[in-house]
């Protein structure tokens, strides 16, 4: 399976974040991809200790080097997402922007 980095905006609403992560992971799996989702462990350090948070973000970005593609989800673009996309461009990774309608369709929500 190809590995795909899942890029989407983090939020402060943990419950909604988990729901979105599950949707995007399932979407990637249904597309035959192995999702790489650093949000699962980055959230543990979210804004608790600035040094830990920065290290967690850098660790997440380092996973781009082992991925075959990056898929960008969500309506808004954050600074972190822009950085992940910039790194992906430098690595010549294919970048795919995926709308919520595409996710709903693939997951049979229509």
Language-model features, listed with the residues they occupy:
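Catalytic phosphate/metal-binding cores of nucleic-acid and nucleotide-processing enzymes, i.e., regions
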Residues: 1-110
């Amino acid at each position: 399976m190809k590995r795909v980095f899942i890029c989407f905006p983090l939020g402060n609403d943990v419950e909604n974040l988990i729901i979105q992560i599950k949707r995007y992971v399932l979407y990637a799996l249904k597309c035959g991809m192995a999702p790489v989702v650093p949000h699962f462990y980055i959230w543990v350090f979210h804004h608790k200790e600035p040094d830990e948070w920065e290290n967690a973000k850098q660790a997440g970005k380092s996973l781009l080097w082992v991925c075959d593609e990056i898929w960008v989800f969500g309506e808004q673009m954050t600074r972190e997402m822009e950085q992940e996309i910039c790194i992906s461009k430098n690595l010549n990774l294919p970048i795919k922007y995926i709308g919520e309608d595409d996710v709903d369709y693939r997951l049979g929500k229509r």
